[in-house]
Amino acid sequence: MAKINTQYSHPSRTHLKVKTSDRDLNRAENGLSRAHSSSEETSSVLQPGIAMETRGLADSGQGSFTGQGIARLSRLIFLLRRWAARHVHHQDQGPDSFPDRFRGAELKEVSSQESNAQANVGSQEPADRGRSAWPLAKCNTNTSNNTEEEKKTKKKDAIVVDPSSNLYYRWLTAIALPVFYNWYLLICRACFDELQSEYLMLWLVLDYSADVLYVLDVLVRARTGFLEQGLMVSDTNRLWQHYKTTTQFKLDVLSLVPTDLAYLKVGTNYPEVRFNRLLKFSRLFEFFDRTETRTNYPNMFRIGNLVLYILIIIHWNACIYFAISKFIGFGTDSWVYPNISIPEHGRLSRKYIYSLYWSTLTLTTIGETPPPVKDEEYLFVVVDFLVGVLIFATIVGNVGSMISNMNASRAEFQAKIDSIKQYMQFRKVTKDLETRVIRWFDYLWANKKTVDEKEVLKSLPDKLKAEIAINVHLDTLKKVRIFQDCEAGLLVELVLKLRPTVFSPGDYICKKGDIGKEMYIINEGKLAVVADDGVTQFVVLSDGSYFGEISILNIKGSKSGNRRTANIRSIGYSDLFCLSKDDLMEALTEYPEAKKALEEKGRQILMKDNLIDEELARAGADPKDLEEKVEQLGSSLDTLQTRFARLLAEYNATQMKMKQRLSQLESQVKGGGDKPLADGEVPGDATKTEDKQQ
């Protein structure tokens, strides 16, 4: 047992009684328990001490204390005093001090460690033993922490389905199958009794499997996230509340009503009691919409989707026709289904195929069907004709629009070719050149290079345009040496300015001595560096090669200036990316440091190839650039125009005053009066006034 150090002892403790009765000990323990119950916080330091001291006192017997018992009792009183001081301190400080709300986790941990260290001075061993003796205290101390951890764990474990993810689309595929199953087979089973009775076990298994998927779909919908101000909401309570406010929630609940219980009364040969399962049709439409968005052939999918809708309508109409025939009586007249007592018409397959044939003829208004006889038959045929007209109009309209959309790009491209042909015929272009033009258009169409990228991307925001350009062109631009270490912002600016260009076989991209206004990056194709005769090839450039980057930088001291130093010719059809000098300089205006770095890289490349005159470079380094001079001239011209406009206005004002003065003098001479005209008075007004007075 550890001893109490003298620095923690108190002089009054030397007057403790040597003999202490059991009543006194019980009174002390009861007082401690009352103090513990009245305190608002868990005294983790006091409880181990009480446990150890009371155990030691009980073991020491009912007689007088030994020296060890006195030490234990002293330690107990010391713990009581320290606990009381801490309790008073916490009451003075307040239960929720303002700085603790903003104190970080590290500061809180440090403060708690300091308080625990002060509480555990000289009593580390009893505290360790007390933890095992007081498991309830440990539980009380960590209650709040455990609750917070459980909440965090629940938040982490909460599964939220992203409606744009592949997992959600797969689930849509899974739930669309039972919905389509119910829409196609429920009506068929309800109208054709043999189909329901002969395969009853199969239908029961499929029906309740579909019900299980329906229930799971409700859970998925309750955990499906939605966007709020562009952010995905993942709070499960908000998701559930949002789902409950939708109309689909009511339809989902109605589709899960256990109407199958009616089987107990009417029997299992009435599957129409499950017609409430048809209310989940929105899942099927959602699956079709998302598939149309994901597929690479949306027009073909729309046509297939339209055909599927028409087939379902024809199928339902056929089943209803057979049900009406059964209600009226098979074979009672020429309009209803023939008598099923005839073996040929009693087969299930013949019943369905005959009904489907009649429905197709009626809805498409093709061919002749037996005329109706009874009033209900007339009403049904009238409704069928109206539905058939609607179907015909839908087919014509949708198929026509789909075909026009599919051929829109082809028609637009063909219109361009026709206009070019008419122009060449009007200008009497040679057949050879006309053939080259037509072949160039054929190459563009065959390689799908007819799309105008700017026209396609103009509806997108600048951020998405930049991301698409980075995804398409950034790797290509990084191949150029001078752009490899550039800032990311400059590269983004440059990729937005790259323009695709196509050259025909034999076309010159540049000739020796031409002024360099663009640089080129080969995306696809082969170019040849040829001699002046255009035949001798020095080197062949392939995909990924680039040229012309030095000539668009205007590097001072370059022996060739900004002129081309070689002849480059296209061997076949070549697809290049072009970056003009104006676009580069426009992008570099916001990145002056990058401009200096690019010029330095270009200068090093020229020095390596011995294509730079250092004296000329040093001599041309002091004067300002030509662009700066042009800007200064432009600003000076604006100033001169402003001054000239001001002088012109002053001249006009002076002229107006002179004219007014001359008019006054003229009126005075003619009228003989000495009174001058007032400002703004028209000559002759004074004379008119005098005449009126006379």
From Swiss-Prot:
Inhibited by L-cis-diltiazem. The keyword Thylakoid does not apply. Changing residue 533 to H: Found in patients with cone-rod dystrophy; likely pathogenic. Changing residue 469 to T: In ACHM2; the dose-response relationship for cGMP-activation is shifted toward a lower cGMP concentration; the left shift in the dose-response relationship of the mutant CNGA3 is less distinctive than in homomeric channels with this mutation indicating a partial rescue effect of the CNGB3 subunit; is in large part located in the cell membrane at 37 and 27 degrees Celsius. The chain crosses the membrane at residues 171-192, 199-219, 247-266, 271-288, 299-321, 348-378, 379-403. Residues 1-24, 109-152, 662-694 are annotated as: Disordered. It catalyses: Ca(2+)(in) = Ca(2+)(out); Na(+)(in) = Na(+)(out); K(+)(in) = K(+)(out); NH4(+)(in) = NH4(+)(out). Residues 298-406 are annotated as: Ion conduction pathway. It is found in: Cell membrane. Changing residue 258 to R: Found in patients with cone-rod dystrophy; likely pathogenic. 3',5'-cyclic GMP binds at residues 548-549, 551, 564-565, 609. Changing residue 334 to F: Found in patients with cone-rod dystrophy; likely pathogenic. Residues 365-368 are annotated as: Selectivity filter. Changing residue 223 to W: In ACHM2; also found in patients with cone-rod dystrophy. It is a multi-pass membrane protein. It is linked to Achromatopsia 2: An autosomal recessive, ocular stationary disorder due to the absence of functioning cone photoreceptors in the retina. It is characterized by total colorblindness, low visual acuity, photophobia and nystagmus. Pore-forming subunit of the cone cyclic nucleotide-gated channel. Mediates cone photoresponses at bright light converting transient changes in intracellular cGMP levels into electrical signals. In the dark, cGMP levels are high and keep the channel open enabling a steady inward current carried by Na(+) and Ca(2+) ions that leads to membrane depolarization and neurotransmitter release from synaptic terminals. The C-terminal coiled-coil domain mediates homotrimerization of CNGA subunits. The cyclic nucleotide-binding domain (CNBD) comprises three helices and a beta-roll of eight beta-strands from CNGA3 and CNGB3 subunits. Upon cNMP binding transmits the conformational changes to the C-linker domain of the S6 helix to open the ion conduction pathway. This is Cyclic nucleotide-gated channel alpha-3. It comes from Homo sapiens (Human). The gene is CNGA3.
